[in-house]
Amino acid sequence: MKNNPKVEDNFPWDQTMRNHFTTFPKFLLSSILLISILCIFYTVSFSNSSNKDLNIITAVHGGREEVAVAPPPVPSPKPSPSSKTTLRQIVFGIAASARLWDHRKNYIKLWWKAQMRGVVWLDKGVKPGIDDHLLPQKMISGDTSKFKYNNPKGHRSAIRISRIVSETLRLGLDDVRWFVMGDDDTFFVPDNLVRVLSKYDHNQFYYIGSSSESHLQNINFSYGMAYGGGGFAISYPLAKALAKMQDRCIQRYPGLYGSDDRIHACMAELGVPLTKEPGFHQYDVFGNLLGLLSAHPVAPLVSIHHLDKVEPIFPNMNRVQALKRLNIPINLDSAALMQQSVCYDKTRSWTVSVSWGYTVQIYRGIFSVREMEMPARTFLNWYKRADYTGFAFNTRPVTRHVCQKPFVYYLSKASYNKVMNQTVSEHVQHQVSNPDCKWKMADPSRIERVEVYRKPDPNLWDKPPRRNCCRVLPTKKKGTMVIDVGVCGDDEVIELR
């Protein structure tokens, strides 16, 4: 029997296989590493090419495809947190006419300050005055005869006025963050304007203002338009963009009525919407502003317009005298101006509404805050045939019953107590005839004066908006009510308890 030959381990082909199995793990590991590197490379490359593709805009014109490459997005510059906007960095452009200058310059003098910058743009020259140092610089607007104007109800001066921001920009003033447009019959509260604009990044495109109080005005023009009389603000970069295209833009809208709708049309072409701030007031109303001012929104009061159309805001004085009176609380605590607080006199069942720096009103009976924060209709609509539904906000009647007619106390004087760190304002009853009331309850007519105490809070608007609380304090002073106004305490609610 033959034995099978022994299989030896050192056959040539076996040595080859052994070498193969020895090097295979190394080869496999190298391959995996190479593939991983290639995957990472192609992933990054594909991501970059995808991002580039996002900037490619494809359009088809007449059956022919055109490709345009948009520039890569530019990162937005961030505002410096240590650099707050100052009054010096706001430049005003004020629309005025030579015909009304001698009268309306008196309004501007009431709010203009020496450290401010701006220009009054006139349609023609006026004589120098001894009070020129109390006013902004005066300039004559550029020629607008080349622009078409064919609105039969308006006036072509609207074109001149619409170009004021652009003309002011071209003066080349340095360190400008905002341009603010206003009329010669607009009263500004400058410190509150600074507070409002400081909320926004001046390096971005901003168009800030508010709409009309008249629903019909907003329908006829636009709810998205800033009304120029109430004032509006345009950031510096947006003003530069506007100046580059405005003359072309104006030519496309010869049928528009005014200046502010022309600005709005150009803003629409620039793609910039209106940022609404409720403190800018066009006041397209007639009559008494008491109802509007005493129920001011929870926002800084920035402007009051149509001073010649409405009654003086304080009775028994002319308009200039009334605004001088308003400057008293503005100089003490402008942040709190016109801010409404509501509280209750429980023992006498009265509702008390305080509009700081302006009025105190006492009502017989208990009214909810929800009702009190609605303006009472002491004013008339811009369109004489329109009723209360013609307003662009909720309103309420002045009174629903003869016994609920408010007793109004207007600011007479105010001062600051350094020791107590609080303002003290005195309000005196406005003497008007009140109807006889047969209700068996305390009569507010016996209150002749109201004292209001409040600690100034310059950082009031650096916090989320909230209405202040007021409290009726006990007093032994005959014929006097004493009220404390301030930040609502923990768990404090405006309610009768």
What are these regions (language model features)?
Residues W178, I219-A233:
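A recurrent flexible, glycine/aromatic-enriched loop bordering the glycosyltransferase active site
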Residues W121-R177, D191:
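Active-site-proximal specificity loops/subdomain of glycosyltransferases
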Residues K2-P71:
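N-terminal signal-anchor transmembrane helix specifying type II single-pass membrane topology
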Residues F188-I219:
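Conserved donor-nucleotide/metal-binding helix-loop-beta segment in metal-dependent transferases, i.e.
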Residues D175-D185:
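Short beta-strand-to-loop acidic/aromatic patch adjacent to the donor-nucleotide binding site
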Residues N3, K26-V44, I57-V60, G255, ...:
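C-terminal catalytic/acceptor-binding lobe
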Residues K84-L87, Y107-G118:
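Short, acidic, metal-binding catalytic loop of nucleotide-sugar glycosyltransferases
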Residues V189-P190, Y227-Q246:
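Conserved nucleotide-sugar donor-binding
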